[in-house]
């Protein structure tokens, strides 16, 4: 029986009370069992995943197909990531701030779950597991709504996790998947203020903008990464080439991959042919401004739209800038506030870049590919927030909690 999105919300609200009451011992034990259940059901997972890939093999890019694929090494890595979440501290544990007021009221500032967390995401079935693990560990119920491209994979994964809850005589609706992949299901979810405490979208900039513009439930913006690398005049060019190559080509379809390259004019004539050669060999299509195109004809002319596009593919934009001020101004006009990088030996320029670039994560001399919950030591991540309220940057367990004030008295009344 297909359950309506509204009914899923109602069930999640009930389940939120159930999961909030679980001890950390129980939550961790469930995660261990879920990890093993994924390993025990690899054949079913891969069979479902093959259905998804077969359905979209001709419409998705190769990087997107790679994100969609669940093979044995990937499933093992996902199962291992659950054990990494087990090893993390309980986000709901104390010590809590406690104080006495002037009328001898005792106030305790507790950390508590958000309640019902809804996730909307595109063709990344690993997010199903990451989101379920982090919400369970932090005492939340979760509603998952993945993209149609991964519906078979997500359904099998969610059922495996729900079966573990059932096997432990717990409410399986602590973890729910919306199997209706229509736009209408998204529209309903965006407006379930009575049931959803926070909505976290993961996907393209266009998709996230749609969610923010149309949701009445609280939203944490995540993910879109029109990420820049600025190569300063003082940069170690060999180091810069290695960083750019890694940030662009290692996993081009993820939000922390580099999309744009800014090069200081003083080194452009020397550096641009070098980086062009390296990237062209890696099958990266280059689109640049007139100045970079003149330095190397392998760089085609970029359109105005290119500068604001997150490619999620082996494509990169290149622009020559006059210096640090110019780079900062350009980035702040085109950034999605995710991750931005400067490659420089100048402490003055680095300090200015770090201070003035408006992004959740700012790097010196390192690949933006490290913007990741696991790499930051948070375990898995629920997403990478590009906004400033509640959470910013890679969101681990603390981002899935809020506070509650408990006040203890002995009959006090306010005069």
Curated annotation (Swiss-Prot):
Reactions this protein catalyses: L-glutamate 5-semialdehyde + phosphate + NADP(+) = L-glutamyl 5-phosphate + NADPH + H(+)
SUPFAM superfamilies: ALDH-like
Pfam families to which the protein is assigned, alphabetical: Aldedh
Pathways involved: Amino-acid biosynthesis; L-proline biosynthesis; L-glutamate 5-semialdehyde from L-glutamate: step 2/2
Gene Ontology terms, MF aspect: glutamate-5-semialdehyde dehydrogenase activity; NADP binding
Cell location: Cytoplasm
Primary localisation category: cytoplasm
GO cellular component: cytoplasm
GO annotation, biological process: L-proline biosynthetic process
Keywords: Amino-acid biosynthesis, Cytoplasm, NADP, Oxidoreductase, Proline biosynthesis
UniProt KW NADP keyword: yes
Enzyme Commission no: 1.2.1.41
Record flagged with keyword Cytoplasm: yes
Function: Catalyzes the NADPH-dependent reduction of L-glutamate 5-phosphate into L-glutamate 5-semialdehyde and phosphate. The product spontaneously undergoes cyclization to form 1-pyrroline-5-carboxylate.
Protein family (similarity comment): Belongs to the gamma-glutamyl phosphate reductase family.
Name of the protein in question: Gamma-glutamyl phosphate reductase
